[in-house]
């Protein structure tokens, strides 16, 4: 099952969070879902050069919150925050409601080369520049390894290097445990429009396992807590004694 299902959808609520966080009735749900899609398409088209990895949308009453995870926040923010106002007005125009309160939060990605979306975008850009796909994959693997990822898998499919018959090739470095639900797997897919046709790109990045509090490793020199038969605590109300 881990190889058949979407890695992010399988881990929602475990290691992945929902990209849209809001509740709605059955009548308004389709409308709000279409709004979210229009907002994401607008942001990706307008700020494609900003290296946007993800767009999270939350709704609270009449307020709309949009969080952008990007590698270059300065492209979005602009000088003295002028870009934020431009983005806010663009979102209001996209959803067709100028009076809607829109709150924008821009988050900078710390490890750019460990992000699956940005790696897939980098591979797509190189393939569109007619760089050999094996060299492109090797360069992407080296960048991810320098970023400290524990595992990486890259798959490219289509008319590779202009071949007459389409095929798929993939490479893997390290561990990519798709069956482990607590494994933090970052997944992304992109398309590259080349002169020979469309190439599909898939990237899996393994960043580690999310452990519960009981499974957290102990500090150096700390002894494990004994699990003996503890006497249960009892609390008695003696406020009325002696009366």
Swiss-Prot record:
Quaternary context: Part of the 30S ribosomal subunit. Forms a tight complex with proteins S10 and S14.
Full protein name: Small ribosomal subunit protein uS3
Gene3D superfamilies per record: 3.30.300.20, Ribosomal protein S3, C-terminal domain
Bias (Basic and acidic residues) ranges: 233-243
Its biological purpose: Binds the lower part of the 30S subunit head. Binds mRNA in the 70S ribosome, positioning it for translation.
Keyword annotations of the record: Ribonucleoprotein, Ribosomal protein, RNA-binding, rRNA-binding
InterPro entries reported for this sequence: KH_dom, KH_dom-like_a/b, KH_dom_type_2, KH_sf_prok-type, Ribosomal_S3_C_sf, Ribosomal_uS3_bac-typ, Ribosomal_uS3_C, Ribosomal_uS3_CS
One GO CC term on file: cytosolic small ribosomal subunit
Region annotated Disordered, chain positions: 216-243
Protein family membership: Belongs to the universal ribosomal protein uS3 family.
Ranges of residues in domain KH type-2: 39-110
GO molecular function per UniProt: mRNA binding; rRNA binding; structural constituent of ribosome
GO biological process: translation
Gene designation per UniProt: rpsC
SUPFAM superfamilies named among the record's database cross-references: Prokaryotic type KH domain (KH-domain type II), Ribosomal protein S3 C-terminal domain
A Pfam family it matches: KH_2
PANTHER family associated with the record: 30S/40S RIBOSOMAL PROTEIN S3, SMALL RIBOSOMAL SUBUNIT PROTEIN US3C
């Amino acid at each position: 099952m881990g190889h058949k299902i979407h890695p992010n959808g399988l881990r929602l609520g475990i290691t992945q969070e929902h990209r849209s966080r809001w509740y709605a009735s059955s009548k308004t749900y389709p409308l709000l879902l279409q709004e979210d899609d229009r907002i994401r398409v607008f942001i990706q088209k307008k700020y494609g050069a900003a290296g946007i990895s993800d767009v999270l949308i939350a709704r609270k009453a009449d307020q709309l919150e949009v969080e952008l995870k990007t590698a270059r926040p300065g492209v979005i923010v602009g000088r003295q925050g002028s870009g934020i106002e431009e983005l806010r007005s663009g979102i209001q125009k996209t959803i067709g409601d100028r009076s809607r309160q829109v709150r924008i939060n821009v988050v900078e990605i710390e490890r750019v080369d460990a992000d699956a979306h940005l790696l897939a975008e980098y591979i797509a850009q190189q393939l569109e520049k007619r760089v050999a796909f094996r060299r492109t994959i090797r360069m992407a693997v080296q960048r991810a390894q320098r970023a400290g990822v524990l595992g990486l898998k890259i798959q490219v499919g289509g008319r590779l290097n202009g071949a007459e018959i389409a095929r798929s090739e993939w490479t893997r470095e390290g561990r990519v445990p798709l069956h482990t639900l607590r494994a933090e797997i970052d997944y992304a897919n992109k398309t590259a429009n080349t002169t020979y046709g469309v190439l599909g790109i898939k990237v899996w990045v393994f960043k580690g396992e999310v452990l519960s509090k009981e499974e957290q490793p102990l500090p150096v020199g700390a002894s494990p807590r004994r699990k003996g038969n503890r006497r249960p605590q009892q609390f008695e109300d003696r406020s009325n004694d002696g009366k």
